[in-house]
């Protein structure tokens, strides 16, 4: 039995609509090359909350909280061809989306 090659693409952004839009765009590009694709798989959203004092030195009880969420999507490509990899390398993603590729 032959070993299947696979590529995992993990997209991360603070804007969920941007992640979804680019995940669908990557899927469209990969479908043109006849590779098998799974996804986009939504991964858990992480919320980050930062608490700071409102004043520089008094009123410890007066605080302000800032929060933001990071959204992630996972795309798996099974048996990618060289054409698939070339087309993925030509994609220009916006600066708001972080891409992590593992094989």
UniProtKB/Swiss-Prot annotation:
Gene3D superfamilies: Ribosomal protein S10 domain. Pfam families: Ribosomal_S10. GO terms for cellular component: ribonucleoprotein complex; ribosome. One of its GO terms (molecular function) is structural constituent of ribosome. SUPFAM superfamilies: Ribosomal protein S10 (SSF54999). Keywords: Ribonucleoprotein, Ribosomal protein. InterPro entries: Ribosomal_uS10, Ribosomal_uS10_CS, Ribosomal_uS10_dom, Ribosomal_uS10_dom_sf. One of its GO terms (biological process) is translation. Belongs to the universal ribosomal protein uS10 family. Involved in the binding of tRNA to the ribosomes. Part of the 30S ribosomal subunit. This is Small ribosomal subunit protein uS10. The gene is rpsJ.
